[in-house]
Amino acid sequence: MATSVATLSSPPPVSLPLLSSSRSSFFSNCFTVTTRPNTRSLVAIGRRIRQEPTRKPLTCNALFGLGVPELAVIAGVAALLFGPKKLPEIGKSIGKTVKSFQQAAKEFESELKTEPEESVAESSQVATSNKEEEKKTEVSSSSKENV
């Protein structure tokens, strides 16, 4: 019987092609993937690329982070669903609802601002009224016991 000894050696370093071009405006860093000489693990090595200053396109994130194209699609679907005759009515009702929510929020905020000032005065009044009520109940209960 012959015994043989097999040794495992690590594969040579592998350099994978980059997934993005260096001029791409979407990626800010380029990474290459290589293997370490004595291990079998992959390591990402980052390189910083100096980007030329570019102009950002005009964007409008007006409603819940939605852009103009998304809002246009939503408006188109709404026009198809409700028709051109009902859209003004729906717009008016949505506007009234939003206005009422804004008004309620302002009232709530004003109540919160005035509440601390009034709460100090009310707490002293409530404390005195509670004491008066306790005295009245004690007097009425004692008068019932006497009868």
Curated annotation (Swiss-Prot):
Predominantly, its location class is plastid
Its subunit composition reads: In thylakoid membranes, TATC and TATB form a large receptor complex, containing about eight TATC-TATB pairs, which binds the precursor protein. Twin arginine signal peptide promotes pH-triggered docking of TATA oligomers to TATC-TATB receptor complex, inducing a conformational switch of TATA that results in activation of the translocase. TATA dissociates from TATC-TATB upon completion of translocation.
Pfam family of the protein (one):
TatA_B_E
Q: Where is the transit peptide?
A: 1-59
The protein here is known as Sec-independent protein translocase protein TATA, chloroplastic
Q: Which organism is it from?
A: Arabidopsis thaliana
Topology term for the membrane:
Single-pass membrane protein
Keywords assigned by UniProt, alphabetized: Chloroplast, Membrane, Plastid, Protein transport, Thylakoid, Transit peptide, Translocation, Transmembrane, Transmembrane helix, Transport
All disulfide bonds of the chain are none
